[in-house]
């Protein structure tokens, strides 16, 4: 019998956050080992519970949420999203401009599939959240990575963006606040990106899932209100700010001129209809989440868990010889730099795997985020301080004797 192979469409699709290193971690756990996980931004396992009022409203609406809804989502949920963004400067957004999906991930894939033809290019940051690159590849497009500059607080390199635009470039992806670096972009930088998009007729895809997870004096500026004359698609959801990643509730909001994008919008509506609708019971969480008390503020200010965990992780990382890190101003991650020459690192996945096998701590290698060099890794700052201290003390011990062959 001939082997059954995966589709050739998946040849360039990669999502190493849940890749071979995670499989090895699962094997270790099955053998009875405890693995400290600093690899994925899933708040619930780290003791971040959802607000009670969200759970109560979902439970209360369960009896009437057993059937399909509109393929774009419940009217009440989309109305709440519309009002949320109108109050933030997107005055012309209507209910029909909003699509609710099974998490932002599903919507990213739909947005790329509806737009890209074979060989079309999409500007994606390096490092990136790798689903963006995977979605572009799955949609027959080509992800062209523009560099973010570590020496400038991980802001995008505007000259590199300009240099990588070609006649095939359809759009640009902006992840702000950024995963994996924790950068929060200034209004001035965003205005410059808008001008580049304007000059080259690019669609802006704005991934803003961490827009309320900000530290110190950081301020988030949504890019869509800065570009009312451009088609901008903003992605957000409940997973991070409201700690309900398992609910799989995300949305995308179309803003700007849409008459010239009728064909693209038809494609989005077709893909939304093909999967019928997003999870209906969990959509009842959206109105409550956006309209109620924003409890995330308790975690991101001094004394709050996210604030204190970020600070402690940053201090400990920078105390490790050969490792340095830009202090994140938002999101749930850090993207430290490791002195590859000092440790002779030429394969960062091997480094992460070696660390896992020796110390039973799970990280993600930097190249998993489409960073071109094997000199970074990502950690999440969700674990409690005790676990962060234990994990990073193990990493310091590991590196003290590490040298790749």
UniProtKB/Swiss-Prot annotation:
Quaternary structure, from the entry: Homodimer.
Domain of life where this protein originates: Bacteria
Main location, first listed in the record: cytoplasm
Organism: Escherichia coli (strain K12)
SUPFAM superfamilies reported in the protein's UniProt record: PLP-dependent transferases (SSF53383)
Keywords assigned: Amino-acid biosynthesis, Aminotransferase, Cytoplasm, Pyridoxal phosphate, Transferase
GO cellular component terms given for this protein: cytoplasm
Induction: Modestly repressed by alanine and leucine via Lrp.
Name of the featured protein: Glutamate-pyruvate aminotransferase AlaA
Subcellular location as annotated: Cytoplasm
Pathway note: Amino-acid biosynthesis; L-alanine biosynthesis
Enzyme nomenclature, EC number: 2.6.1.2
Modified positions (N6-(pyridoxal phosphate)lysine) in chain numbering: 240
Catalysed transformations (reactions): L-alanine + 2-oxoglutarate = pyruvate + L-glutamate
Gene Ontology molecular function, alphabetical: L-alanine:2-oxoglutarate aminotransferase activity; protein homodimerization activity; pyridoxal phosphate binding; transaminase activity
The family this protein is said to belong to: Belongs to the class-I pyridoxal-phosphate-dependent aminotransferase family.
UniProt-annotated binding residues for L-alanine: 41, 179, 378
Record-level GO BP terms: alanine biosynthetic process; D-alanine biosynthetic process; DNA damage response; L-alanine biosynthetic process from pyruvate; response to antibiotic
Cited Pfam families: Aminotran_1_2 (PF00155)
Annotated InterPro entries: Ala_Aminotransferase (IPR051926), Aminotransferase_I/II_large (IPR004839), PyrdxlP-dep_Trfase (IPR015424), PyrdxlP-dep_Trfase_major (IPR015421), PyrdxlP-dep_Trfase_small (IPR015422)
Cofactor: pyridoxal 5'-phosphate
Gene coding for it: alaA
Broadest EC class assigned to this enzyme: transferase
């Amino acid at each position: 019998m001939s082997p059954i192979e995966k589709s050739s469409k998946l040849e360039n699709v990669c999502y190493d956050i849940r890749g071979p290193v995670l499989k090895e971690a699962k094997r270790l756990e099955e053998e009875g080992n405890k693995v400290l996980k600093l690899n994925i931004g899933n708040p619930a396992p780290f003791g971040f519970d959802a607000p009670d009022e969200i759970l109560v409203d979902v439970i209360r609406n369960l009896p009437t949420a057993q059937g399909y809804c509109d393929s774009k989502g419940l009217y009440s949920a989309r109305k709440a999203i519309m009002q949320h963004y109108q109050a933030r400067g997107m005055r012309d957004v209507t209910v029909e401009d909003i699509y609710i999906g099974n998490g932002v991930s599903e919507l990213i894939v739909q947005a790329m599939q509806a737009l890209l033809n074979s060989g079309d290019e999409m500007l994606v940051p390096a490092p990136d959240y790798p689903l963006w690159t995977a979605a572009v590849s799955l949609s027959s497009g080509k992800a062209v990575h523009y560099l973010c500059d570590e020496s400038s607080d991980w802001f995008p390199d505007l000259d590199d963006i300009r240099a990588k635009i070609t006649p095939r470039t359809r759009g640009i992806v902006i992840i702000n606040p950024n995963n994996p670096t924790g950068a929060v972009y200034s209004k001035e930088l965003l205005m410059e990106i808008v001008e580049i998009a304007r000059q080259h007729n690019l669609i802006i895809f704005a991934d803003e899932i961490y827009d309320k997870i900000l530290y110190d004096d950081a301020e988030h500026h949504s890019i869509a209100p800065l570009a009312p004359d451009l088609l901008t698609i903003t992605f957000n959801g409940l997973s991070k700010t409201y700690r309900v990643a398992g609910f799989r509730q995300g949305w995308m909001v179309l803003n700007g001129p849409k008459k010239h994008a009728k064909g693209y919008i038809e494609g989005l509506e077709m893909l939304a209809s093909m999967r019928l609708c997003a999870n209906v019971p969990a959509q009842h969480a959206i109105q409550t989440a956006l309209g109620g008390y924003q409890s995330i503020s308790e975690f991101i200010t001094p004394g709050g868990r996210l604030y204190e965990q970020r600070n402690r992780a940053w201090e400990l990382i920078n105390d490790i010889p050969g490792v340095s890190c830009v202090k994140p101003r938002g999101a749930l991650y850090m993207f430290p730099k490791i002195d590859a020459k000092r440790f002779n690192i030429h394969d960062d996945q091997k480094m992460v795997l070696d660390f896992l096998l020796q110390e039973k701590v799970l990280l993600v290698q930097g190249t998993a985020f489409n960073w071109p060099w094997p000199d970074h890794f990502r950690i999440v700052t969700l674990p409690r301080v005790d676990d962060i201290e234990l994990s990073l003390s193990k990493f310091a011990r590991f590196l003290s004797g590490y040298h790749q062959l």
